[in-house]
């Protein structure tokens, strides 16, 4: 069951990343349909990624109050619904606004997957599951332009959104109907509530039940905490900056490749999409290394009596990060 849940949340993460990039394959079609410049069409990507940055600050804290599953189900439903106006949009404004809403809503799965895996797996077991999750946000943007190129050439840009609807709807069904709640405090609170109803004994309580703070105060604490971690914990700040650089490079390719290969060399969108295959292959190769990396981590666990330093997880990144500037050359 743990691997089933892991596979479903990783697939959802892939779908979200795929949705962010698939439309890059036919931005020219959007510009032609609505009579706007390509820079304006690019806003459909920009606002989606901005939503990625806004959503986590609310959804991650809320999941600690409501549980993971309600946040997954509600945000994915909103995201799926707002793909439809994108597919049938009659003006660029509708497209941009709905993409922003989708970006905010789709941020929830991207944010909660790490917490879900932490709920499911012990610290020493998380290496391979986390590798599956970490690979998904990078494979999705690599596969998106590839699939989108052929779809856009054959069916037009609107089908890029119908494709998102199909994939996201499938993920919504899987997450909503097959993935149970994983957040331990929420599970315990529900179990205690059930026991109180069955026995009439009020002694069955959890830590959440004993927290008598008003909901507003709890929300304030949970909503402020991400900003405190970001700006007051150097490791969180620097990892966030590092990941921002990686994602900025990735999304820069979405804009640069069409300029280089379509405008510069006269290639079609489908042929240009093939240039993203090496990126996907690289991510898959990296994920395949995770069992070996996890083996080293297990040795560190044994060496430190089950309590290895958190920085032990950073060793593979310290070596692999140098491949990025080399690859850009």
Specify the residue positions occupied by each region the protein language model found.
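A six-helix transmembrane bundle that forms the core substrate pathway of small-molecule transporters
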Residues: 1-329
